[in-house]
């Protein structure tokens, strides 16, 4: 029960091909590949387009002053 032999994996592969068919498996592979590529491109774009978080916070509060009064609880 520890490891699976090559025969086990071949039977599993055969069952998957019979259940889904080769065309459906090809479509799933294509969709998965395009999703991974899109994720990698998005991560690359996000890394180059954004500034560090400290700089963003300082820029947004440096331009404006906020004056707030608090009400005592009573």
From Swiss-Prot:
What protein family does this chain belong to? Belongs to the TatA/E family.
State what this protein does: Part of the twin-arginine translocation (Tat) system that transports large folded proteins containing a characteristic twin-arginine motif in their signal peptide across membranes. TatA could form the protein-conducting channel of the Tat system.
Per UniProt, which keywords does this protein have? Cell inner membrane, Cell membrane, Membrane, Protein transport, Translocation, Transmembrane, Transmembrane helix, Transport
Q: Name one GO biological process term.
A: protein transport by the Tat complex
Question: NCBIfam families this protein is in?
Answer: PRK02958.1 (NF002813), tatAE (TIGR01411)
**Source superkingdom:** Bacteria
Q: Which residues form a coiled coil?
A: none
- State where composition is biased (Polar residues): 56-68
Subunit record text = The Tat system comprises two distinct complexes: a TatABC complex, containing multiple copies of TatA, TatB and TatC subunits, and a separate TatA complex, containing only TatA subunits. Substrates initially bind to the TatABC complex, which probably triggers association of the separate TatA complex to form the active translocon.
Q: Which organism is it from?
A: Verminephrobacter eiseniae (strain EF01-2)
Q: Where are the transmembrane segments?
A: 1-21
Spans annotated as Disordered: 50-74
What name goes with this protein? Sec-independent protein translocase protein TatA
Report disulfide bridges, numbered on this chain. Answer: none
- How would you describe this protein's topology in the membrane? Single-pass membrane protein
Alphabetically, the GO molecular function entries are: protein transmembrane transporter activity
């Amino acid at each position: 029960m520890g490891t699976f032999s090559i025969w086990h994996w071949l039977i599993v592969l055969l069952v998957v091909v019979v259940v889904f068919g080769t065309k459906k498996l090809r479509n799933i592979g294509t969709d998965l590949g395009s999703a991974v590529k899109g994720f990698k491109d998005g991560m690359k774009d996000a890394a180059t387009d954004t500034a560090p978080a400290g700089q963003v916070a300082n820029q947004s509060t440096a331009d404006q002053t906020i004056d707030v009064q608090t009400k005592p609880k009573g």
